[in-house]
């Protein structure tokens, strides 16, 4: 039925995506949807939001942000951009003027897409982007954008992104998990250890937020990870560094010997100075 179709060419596809699959409180068919459009054509945000509304459903969208970036500058593509940004189209066109770099303008696209789903569903939507660099130049090629209503799904996808990213980045609101094939074919040592800088940034954030408190490492992670792109491994390393700096004390309650000072576990109790 769908083999020779793309979203937008057949109304039955939109109808399928907008179907409520719940029986009472439960979704009979929790599903994962991967959208790989031709650039940006066929991305109907309101339709996809109806799919995401069903419990357990999650979405990956493969985005050619370069083409979206260009289309936002050309009024001829306004109908397509209005399908992509049904609420924030005018806002994103205006806000782009105040972004000084291409990276900031591309991140504005990602952030506004996340806002679209959250506004339409009137519910918390977690979104995370994975960036692909061009093969032959130092520029962004595509993003994969993941959307979920589940904090657990948000946790899991960040772990997967971290496993595949090969570019050290600092999560500063512009940069995200990144893969650059050039680093495989022509590996060059980075001038700065961006991964270490990223951990130090998280470490300082955690200490500022939890100084003087006591809680399990799991509860800290569960509470704090929903606020940003850092994954479970980042938190474990950052907490161990705080422990080595004597800024927190770690105690295990499971009566087992552990080779590390902190694990993201309910059995690992943290007491911050």
Task: Describe each model-derived feature in a short phrase.
Residues 1-218, 222-273:
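Class I S-adenosyl-L-methionine-dependent methyltransferase catalytic core
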